[in-house]
Amino acid sequence: MERPIRFIAEAIYENRLKPFTFSAGTNLNWKYMDNQYLGDVVSENGIRSLGIYGFAQIKGSLGQFKEGTSRLTYVAGFGLSNQSYRQGDEEFSFWLCRPKLTLAYSLSSSFQIRLGSELSQHISQIAMISDTRIRKNSMEWTVGNPSLKPNSRYENWVVFSFSKPRINTDFTLNYRINRHCNLAKYTRTEDDQFLYTQANQPHCNMLYLTNDTRFDIIPDHLIFSVNAGIYRFFNKGDEYSHCYTAYNYGGTLQGYWGKWTVMLYADSGWNFMEGENIGHNPPSLATSASYHIGDFDFTLYMHNPFMAHPKSYSAEIVNALLRKQVRGYDNSGGNLLRIGVAWNINRGKEYRKIQRNINNEERETGILK
């Protein structure tokens, strides 16, 4: 039985001055949950949280090329946030100063360098701060930790961009630092039960170098896009230290001939490490062809052809007390063939409405997932 209440409000001010544009704003997010769970899981959660954030920034440009584009653009700002929380006897109030600076300098109309640095706030999933305890199997339990606190995330990046009429490429170097973040923690009891929970621990950092390239083989007819990256993960817990290197890549080939559109997509999946968990999302292969005639679009789509039982996920736990490998397979995801027909019946004049509503949907339940 769920009884969540949530209130969100925000206000933004902007003034376009001559040398730069000044903007400021504030955001308030209040939430109360008093949920009761019965059956296999017995839990009653009374959680109150309040988040307040305010910021001010300036945005401008200096110098111009003959084409009219700016040589140097900048954004400099400062924010202050507070996150307070209470559940039973547990409560905290977390303050964080949040500066931000981004610079973009164009060496020419084709080559640009972008630099950035930002300090932000990261809040652990609400599902992990309940006081619930769930049995996973005969030897494993998942346990909530109401004493989890938010943490700061410090991110620095540099992007090298090159652009020509037929080719666009970006090289991105990024270093993300998560200090005192929530990471996995395993405990072995005297009766050989393994308790999994999360706790604030030293850091979980990521350094990566990626490239995104688009090449128009035949302009407006045949386009090839590719992305590739090297990712290095650094995980430091209270009782462990793990590093992991992953290589992720993918590509898309798109063709346009008259009323025909053809697409071929392939990737290596996403590989990562967080805490003591190594995750592997499997490779994917897809192709589609569509034909447009009048008000109709006919589409043929294939996903993972020639694969009867493709792997949907795999994970590995590398804890000193617990070694575990998990794999999942999806019969419905292999040799998938889908035929689609779309009929456009729009007639008359169309007017676009201005969307002024804040779209927020409450999906948090306060229980472990």
Locations of regions flagged by a protein language model:
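Exposed, low-structure sequence patches enriched in small/polar residues
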Residues: 2-369
